[in-house]
């Protein structure tokens, strides 16, 4: 069987829309085009009903009350609304200190940096070498004036799953608002917001086979969590996020989350088998290092460093497969991955990392093709590397004193 190339193995960057999602969206672009805020006629009522049905589907996936779901333009906006909104609301009574992690997505890191510019203080925790955070270190980072903590559920680069329940319990004890970026988690891990001690949680549709440009923020009702709006005008979404709702996008997100809820368990079994097959094949190559914990990890992610190969040249060499080095949002810069550096990986290994992320439409044939392609291209690139030659000769490269020019 011939494999169609290029092969898409970058599902953590974005996913194709599931055909069932696209089909459900189209009528809301053409026939049911009303504004959900139009209360005086049937076009508006139809749109509003569709929006509320989708809200219920999003809530069902994470076991929340539909009234706790606020529509946004995506997880980046949700992160901004949650962190800035909660910090601004609670800082007068609590203080201006924020705790987060060095391996968070830039949408969290840069939001916290912006608050620092406005007079807040922030602590950026360093994770353990496996990517997980030490709970004692987290607890020690909290202060009497800590207003908010933000820890992602699933890391976008290395796929590790943090112990959100334990972290949330520590926050509850200390009266700290707890925000979780769950953009990479929906449809991959079970989320139960009735049980999890989480106050705010960000979601994205396009990481879960839904459309781009739509996301949501969970805002807890009991105990009630308050946030200050960041977008003003019209008072939509119970005053938390103004702007005409994009009915077709919202319908798409609802359908994507419905499918995720119904098919997640069986899908994860299949995807984990493919991931393990890929890992087994790539481990036959010498000097490969898996980044991040393999146990506490989502099924679809594999992040591997190939020593003595430069990441960018490797990506150019394997043009038949769509993979990434680092996060899609920051891989335009040639800096080594800040996530891998936070784990203590050397610049060389951080630079030689490739993130493979498998998804709903990946086949076994595509995985086998990828393994063969990687083996052949890495072999060729290493033949060109004087460092690889020295390694084969048994030279300890860490002990070499390199001359500067």
Swiss-Prot record:
Keywords: 2Fe-2S, Cytoplasm, Iron, Iron-sulfur, Metal-binding, Pyridoxal phosphate, Transferase. [2Fe-2S] cluster binds at residue 329. Pathway: Cofactor biosynthesis; iron-sulfur cluster biosynthesis. It comes from the Bacteria. This is Cysteine desulfurase IscS. Its main location: cytoplasm. It is found in: Cytoplasm. The modification N6-(pyridoxal phosphate)lysine is found at residue 207. Its EC number is 2.8.1.7.
């Amino acid at each position: 069987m011939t494999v169609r190339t290029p092969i898409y193995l970058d599902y953590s960057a974005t996913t194709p829309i599931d055909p069932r999602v696209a089909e459900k969206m189209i009528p809301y672009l053409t026939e049911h085009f009303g504004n959900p805020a139009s209360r005086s006629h049937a076009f508006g009522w139809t749109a509003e009903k569709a929006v509320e049905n989708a809200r219920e589907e999003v809530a069902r996936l994470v076991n929340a009350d539909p009234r706790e779901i606020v529509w946004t333009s995506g997880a980046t906006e949700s992160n901004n609304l949650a962190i800035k909104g909660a910090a601004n609301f609670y800082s007068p009574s609590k203080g201006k200190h924020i705790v987060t992690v060095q391996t968070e997505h830039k949408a969290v890191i840069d939001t916290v940096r912006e608050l620092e510019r406005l007079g807040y203080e922030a602590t950026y925790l360093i994770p353990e070498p496996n990517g997980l955070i030490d709970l004692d270190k987290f607890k020690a980072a909290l202060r009497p004036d800590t207003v908010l903590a933000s820890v992602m559920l699933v890391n976008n680069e290395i796929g590790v799953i943090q112990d959100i329940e334990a972290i949330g319990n520590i926050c509850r004890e200390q009266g700290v608002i707890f925000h979780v970026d769950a953009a990479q988690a929906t449809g991959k891990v079970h989320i139960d917001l009735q049980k999890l001690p989480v106050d705010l949680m960000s979601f994205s549709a396009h990481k879960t086979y839904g459309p781009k440009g739509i996301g949501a923020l969970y805002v807890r009702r009991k105990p009630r969590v308050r946030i200050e709006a960041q977008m003003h005008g019209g008072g939509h979404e119970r005053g938390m996020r103004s702007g005409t709702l994009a009915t077709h996008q919202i319908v798409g997100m609802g359908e994507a989350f419905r499918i995720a809820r119904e098919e997640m368990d069986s899908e994860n079994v299949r995807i984990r088998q493919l991931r393990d097959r890929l890992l087994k094949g790539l481990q036959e190559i010498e000097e490969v290092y898996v980044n991040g914990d393999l146990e506490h990890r989502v099924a679809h992610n594999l992040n591997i460093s190939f020593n003595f190969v430069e990441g960018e040249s490797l990506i150019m060499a394997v043009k038949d497969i769509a993979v990434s080095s680092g996060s899609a949002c920051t891989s335009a810069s040639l800096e080594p991955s800040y996530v891998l550096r936070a784990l203590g990986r050397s610049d060389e290994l951080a630079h030689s990392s490739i993130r493979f992320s498998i998804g709903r439409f990946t086949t076994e044939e595509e995985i086998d093709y990828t393994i063969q392609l990687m083996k052949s291209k890495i072999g060729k690139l290493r033949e060109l590397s004087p460092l690889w030659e020295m390694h084969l000769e048994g030279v300890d490269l860490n002990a070499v004193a390199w001359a500067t020019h």
